[in-house]
Design a protein with these regions (language model features):
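Active-site-proximal alpha/beta segments of enzymes that process anionic O-linked groups
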Residues: 1-13, 18-178
Length: 179
């Protein structure tokens, strides 16, 4: 589907597979847990979804597969085309930028980058990088796009029990933070 202005279509998927929709104000939660996202008029928040599992190794391959929750099998999914394969076959450039523990084979056939590589400051400390690192260099990348493109930003997300390490102090709103 061509864009009206002739520019390439750019789709940015932000994947944070351990986040609970019930705790996002975007989905009706009564506390303002994501006010910056709410201010962006271009956000599409998918509301009628559920996870195939509670671990990245299952939930990530499932969300990019054609299989539903009931019929999903990790081994079967490895040998099927997933959403990213189909986008690539349709002529899209497809990139995966990761701030978690990898794509669990979802991005094996496309371009991928480990955002944590190089331990960039001020985003990284020890074994962790805040998800803001996924935005590092993104604006420059967006300016150089000449073809339809899908970019997946895989967040570390809200894995416990060290929740307080998932965000910089400037975003600390709810206490106690168990740090």
């Amino acid at each position: 589907i061509p864009t009206q202005d002739g520019k390439p279509r750019v789709i940015v998927l932000i994947v944070g597979e351990t986040a609970r929709a019930q705790n996002f104000s975007l989905y009706g939660y009564n506390r303002q847990t994501n006010p910056l996202l709410a201010q962006n008029g271009e956000i599409i928040a998918f509301k009628d979804v559920s996870s195939c599992g509670t671990a990245t190794a299952v939930s990530l391959p499932c969300m990019f597969s054609k299989l539903g929750r009931k019929e999903f099998d990790v081994t079967d999914a490895q040998y099927m085309q997933n959403l990213l394969d189909i986008a690539k076959a349709a002529g899209y450039d497809v990139f995966w930028k990761d701030n978690d523990d990898g794509c669990k084979k979802v991005c094996d056939r496309i371009g991928k980058t480990d955002a944590k590589q190089g331990n960039k400051q001020p985003y990284c400390f020890g074994n962790y990088c805040h998800d803001e690192i996924l935005l590092d260099g993104l604006e420059k990348q967006l300016q150089t796009i000449t073809r339809n493109t899908v970019i997946v930003l895989h967040m570390m997300g809200s894995h416990g029990p060290t929740y307080y390490k998932r965000y910089p102090d400037k975003f600390k709103r709810f206490t106690p933070a168990c740090d």
